[in-house]
Regions:
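Catalytic cores of nucleotide-enabled group-transfer and carboxylate-activating enzymes in metabolic
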Residues: 116, 151, 208-216, 257-258, ...
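Short, hydrophobic alpha-helical segments
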Residues: 158, 190-198, 326-330, 463-470
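Flexible phosphate-sensing "switch/lid" loops adjacent to ATP/NTP-binding sites
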Residues: 1-253, 263-279, 286-287, 293-300, ...
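C-terminal and late-domain segments of enzyme folds
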Residues: 365, 372-470
Length: 470
């Protein structure tokens, strides 16, 4: 979920598997409990069985934290969200828990009339009241400043204190939002609702203010080509987009991302778009669609000594490109895309996870069978990747089913391409880099998921730095 990534970036905390749940997971848990006999043969109902499962998920974290944030997706009135709203209603009645319910609404602006319309917000709150929930704070998304009369009207008709109606206006940068919310009093309204005294919990916005200053004082402009197949929906690469921005801020650079659809561009138009780019990045993905365009982009970066960054599938395709065009291995490819005896990338059948061996074959279900989550990698000293991380052992998040075939490693190293990062057991290549190239790195993991605005990922900082100096 996109919002989960925003929470990670703004709180500087990495989410756990238990930090997100879907309706499907809730219903699956209920059905499993019924099969086990936990309900003693009683008829399964949305209330109490489904709502109790939702409450159990929420309560599981409350014991260990001072404040927990829970976001319910969707729109008030959606059938899918009703059990979640009911669970929230029940939890709100628990006298041992202080809570604050924030309702996000949209305030449309009619340019022809020159006024903001609060009626949709009033009806939205009415829908919530029908579900037995009274919001404590209303966040008002708007493209225009919200006048005092509109705020007073929302307060009056929605049973919310005037100081708890918070404008949430568009900002030039998402990293201005904490300062804007504080300006309109969100922090004080929230603390009061949760039973805290605002004067005892002063908000430290200095890091965010300093970040805004760095953004405004950027000296360089750098053009980065991101060659993928999901570029029509840029939010598909949201974490990647933000990580590049973070790397740019750290280098005092404004990153101009050129989104290139690898499936729709022919080789001639692709080369035209890549020309003039300071760096080329191939992101992760699945499936054969669009891979030829990505491979051609990697070849262009390699032959023209342009900084190249391959992530997950991007690293695997770099291995394929080098195998085909440098090592001259006939029919070199990935078993994900082509049946060949020269699979330089193949399906993993087993790997170590927390001291346990996980196994899978080609007939296994795809769901839940990936090498998924945080895994360690050991970096070779005197490598570029080691100089970037400044650590021998790193931990990064993974999401893949295919891995570089170890049988070909020596052939790559003989041509100046070596695997400078491996899994702790030495079986799975994690990092590819080139001795001949100024900056040519492929990683099997997803570093973008750990980049933060106040703590940018070192790989993206190094990549943008190399692109500036190109």
């Amino acid at each position: 979920d996109l919002d989960l990534g925003h929470y990670e970036r703004f709180t500087n905390q990495s989410a756990k598997q238990s930090d997100s749940v879907s309706s499907g997971k809730i219903y699956s848990n209920v059905l499993l409990k019924e099969r086990k006999g936990d309900y003693l043969g009683s008829t399964i109902q949305v209330i109490p069985h489904v709502t109790n499962e939702i409450k159990s998920f929420i309560n599981s974290d409350l014991k260990n934290e001072d404040i927990a944030i829970y976001e319910i997706g969707g729109t008030v009135g959606d059938i899918e969200s009703l059990p979640f709203l009911e669970a929230i209603r029940q939890i709100r009645n628990d006298k041992n828990i202080s809570s604050a319910l924030i309702h996000m609404t949209y305030i449309p602006y009619l340019s022809s009339a020159g006024e903001l319309k609060t009626k949709p917000t009033q009806h939205s709150v009415k829908e919530l009241l029908n579900a037995g929930i009274q919001p404590d704070i209303i966040m008002c998304r708007s493209e225009q400043p919200i006048d005092n009369d509109s705020i007073s009207k929302i307060s009056l008709f929605c049973n919310v204190k005037k100081e708890s109606v918070i404008p949430a206006l568009n900002a030039k940068s998402i990293y201005e939002v904490p300062s804007l919310y504080s300006k309109y009093g969100l922090d004080e309204a929230l603390l009061k609702q949760l039973g805290y005294k605002p004067k005892n919990h002063k908000l430290n916005l200095k890091p965010w203010i300093d970040l805004q200053k760095k953004i405004k004082k950027r000296k360089h402009k750098v053009k980065i080509a991101v060659v993928g197949k999901y570029t029509n929906l840029k939010d598909s690469y949201k974490s990647l987009n933000e990580a590049l921005v973070h790397g740019g801020i750290e280098n005092s650079a404004d990153v101009d991302i050129q989104w290139i659809n690898s499936e729709k561009e022919n080789n001639i138009s692709l080369m035209k778009k890549l020309k003039g780019c300071d760096g080329i990045l191939i992101p992760g993905g699945f499936g054969i669609r669009g891979i030829n365009g990505k491979i051609n982009a990697i070849k262009y970066a390699r032959e023209n000594n342009i900084p190249f960054f391959g992530i997950c599938l991007g690293m695997q395709l770099a291995v394929i490109e080098i195998a085909q065009n440098v090592l001259k291995i006939k029919n070199a490819h990935s078993s994900e895309f082509k049946k060949t005896t020269k699979s330089v990338v193949g399906l993993m059948t087993e790997w170590v996870n927390k001291n346990k061996i996980e196994k899978r074959d080609k007939n296994s279900d795809k769901g839940g069978t990936m090498r998924l989550g945080a895994y360690k990698a050991v970096l070779k000293k005197n490598s570029k990747i080691f100089s970037i991380y400044k650590n021998k052992v790193i931990s990064e998040r993974h999401r893949h089913r295919y891995e570089v075939n170890q049988k070909f490693l020596s052939k790559f190293e003989n041509k100046g391409y070596y695997f400078s990062g491996m899994s702790p057991d030495g079986l799975l290549p994690e990092v590819l880099e080139s001795k001949k190239h100024k900056w040519f790195i492929g990683v099997q993991f997803h570093p973008e998921l750990k980049s933060r605005p106040l703590d940018p990922h070192p790989l993206f900082v190094s990549f943008i730095k190399a692109a500036i100096n190109d």
